[in-house]
Amino acid sequence: VIYMAQLKMFWINDKKVELLPLPEGYSFSTYKDEADKAAWVECCKNGLVGDDTKPEFFDDCIAGDEHCNPCTDCFFLDYNGEHIGTITAINQGGIGDMHMVGMKTEFRGKGLGKYLNNMCIYKLANEGVSHIYLTTDEWRKGAVKSYLTSGFLPVQYEMGMEERWEKVLEEYGIDSVDMLYEDCTLYKKIYRSSLAKRVKIGVVGARRGQTMLNYCKTGFNCDVVAICDNAPDFLAGAKEKYGEDGITYYDNFDEFIKHDMDGVVLANFANEHTPLAIKAMKAGKHVLSEVLPCQHMKEAVELVEAVEETGMIYAYAENYCYMPAPREMRIQYREGKLGKFEYGEGEYVHNCEPGWHGYSNCDPEHWRNTMSAFYYCTHSLGPLVHITGLRPVKVSGFEIPFNDRMYRMGAKAGAMAVEMVTLENGAVLKSIHGVGPSRNSVWYSVYGSKGRLESAREDDSDKEGVGTLFGNLDSYEGENNDNPKEMDTSDSLSKLAEDSGHGGSDFYTMYHFIQAIKGNRNAEIVDVYEAMDMFLPGHFGYLSAMNNNKSYDIPDLRDKAQRDIWRNDTTCTVKEKAGDMYIPSYSKGNPEIPDEVYEALKKKRENS
């Protein structure tokens, strides 16, 4: 099932309304008695109701609304005494509802819809409503055009709406129209597709950046204009795949950042994002950073302050937040259906041995071989933080020992890590992640005062793992009604995202970043503060593991006073970044891995 939200439109009551004079032979009447129910159904066929709809449906749809009085609110447009069209104008406590606008087939295409709209607007405006809303669909072309002509404006209330309306305007030959938010404030003026400004994007990292490049090349709201990579082979491969029409290629970031573009995607090495992000923002570019946001606390402080000082958009591409199950978990929690948040678990464990020779380039000093087990924590922890919006305040870390698999991979760290995190409301999270387990698992589970939500396990071959969500929720606290069921995880972007990487989640990170650049305050990005809330539990979790699992407070980098404490702290596992604050990547001291291991990995790479 592909979910597609209806279009929503508002008419703002800020102008005087007069009734339009009707053509000869036409008049208005209101609902009078039972006989009008059948006429109402006939007017609503061909789109609003099925051909077999009974007159009794009027009671459910119109008369059953507690705010509706059919005798004053349900209008008929009559031709020579026959009901040929209908509209219902309901005052929903100061907000107008234009409801069930229908016209008999033989009277369509005559421009009569404007008279129905006008009657509804006139009635509700004179009752003093703040605005009138309606919902409709693109395929009701005549109706949509008549609403626009009557002064209704599109509403940006769900992702994908702007692009859908651009297509509508293009089809109708309308150059532009104002678009509103749901609170009736102006979002911005939007333009037909052929006139809409496309966001210009540059991508750093031609390998991991391919998903972002593909989005830009096939997407509907941006173009890739520059690609940067210091690896000649990767840059040449990108040039062959994406061509040179409209794209400039760079092997130097400082030259790349001078290019005329709106935003930059950082898909380079995970421990090298911060310096490039800061340079980009200071050059006036918005930034989408792949995981991870920074290497140590000094970089964390510098990154936060660069965002604050420049005012540029920083979005953290924690794509697992947008996997179907955690994405829907967030919606359910934010709508209050889970109740008060109490506990959550996140797993991102990945047996990387089969591909490690490619991931790490067989290099003993590659960042993947020198990271602690705690470093790559945001795939497991990030979705839980994003679901709740709650800040982590304490963490205790536990390290799973270095094992034979990690030895064979040449990775100098524990096989996995566990963070036990306390949130600001007292709830607890368990996050487990790592590259050295024997099997894979991506899984999330959250508990609230009204029940539980969790994704399917990967080993359940009948389900789609993190693409499947199970819910067992009470309608109120204390109901204790055990009612497990599989839940729908589709939304208005699911169809567009289905061919994108990581279960479609890569589409969402790019889409929301582009929407943020375009000024949409509803864009669901992970900002720099939330990125730190996802990263810091891993950083301090490792310090905990090195100190007998001692609990560590997690700083709030929104607070400058707390930033000052960590401003010069370079504690990390990369020698050239840490200086005299260097710590080993394994809590018991870095394991000795002979050169022969890396030579064997090189042979494996050559033969693959």
How would you describe each model-predicted region?
Residues E244-A306:
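Beta-loop-alpha module in the N-terminal Rossmann-like domain of NAD(P)-dependent dehydrogenases
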Residues V1-G25:
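Acyl-donor-binding surface of acyltransferase catalytic domains
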Residues M103, G109-N126, K145-T149:
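Conserved acetyl-CoA-binding loop-helix of GNAT-fold acetyltransferases
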Residues K45-K104:
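A conserved beta-strand-loop-helix scaffold within acyl/acetyltransferase catalytic domains
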Residues R192-G243:
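N-terminal Rossmann-like dinucleotide-binding module
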Residues N319, L423, K450-V526, D564-S608:
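C-terminal glycine/acidic-rich active-site capping loop/insertion
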Residues R207, I313-A315, Y320-A411:
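Predominantly a Rossmann-like dinucleotide-binding segment in NAD(P)-dependent oxidoreductases
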Residues E18-K54, I174-K189, C216-C222:
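Short amphipathic alpha-helix that is part of the acyltransferase structural core
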